Curated annotation (Swiss-Prot):
It comes from Corynebacterium jeikeium (strain K411). The keyword Cytoplasm does not apply. InterPro entries: Ribosomal_bL9, Ribosomal_bL9/RNase_H1_N, Ribosomal_bL9_bac/chp, Ribosomal_bL9_C, Ribosomal_bL9_C_sf, Ribosomal_bL9_N, Ribosomal_bL9_N_sf. This is Large ribosomal subunit protein bL9. Binds to the 23S rRNA. GO terms for biological process: translation. Keywords: Ribonucleoprotein, Ribosomal protein, RNA-binding, rRNA-binding. The keyword Methyltransferase does not apply. GO terms for cellular component: ribonucleoprotein complex; ribosome. Belongs to the bacterial ribosomal protein bL9 family. PROSITE patterns: RIBOSOMAL_L9. The gene is rplI.
Amino acid sequence: MKLILTANVDNLGVPGDIVEVKAGYGRNYLLPRGYAIVATRGAEKQIEGIKRAQEARQIRDLDHAREVKEELENLSGVTISVRTAESGKMFGSVTADNIVDAVKKANGRSLDKHSIKLRKGDVKATGVYSVDVQLHEGIVASLSFEVVSA
């Protein structure tokens, strides 16, 4: 099945890419979630125009991503308060949503929770941690934050 991606899909492509996938994957996952549209001649021509506009925007976005990277790497005071037992063990774990909220409180910048590369179960105790934030293709910022007991 030939599809045109409308969203960034891991291990498949970026918006505007024309990909060949198995019919079930396309019909049951990509199309219902709006990650892709069926590739037709008209859609392919439309995508070419969109890609040209995206390339122009990408140059501006790259400069912006570099600025944000510098800002995030120099950011201090990112603190996440969590409930803990008397032994210091957390109830649950810190999620990407918690990190996004903490960054927003620290400097007012909103991040996409999907851009934070946090493996499930990584942060389960108090302490200082670091995560990678994918800002742009090839630009990854390292963000440090502290998890404290509330």
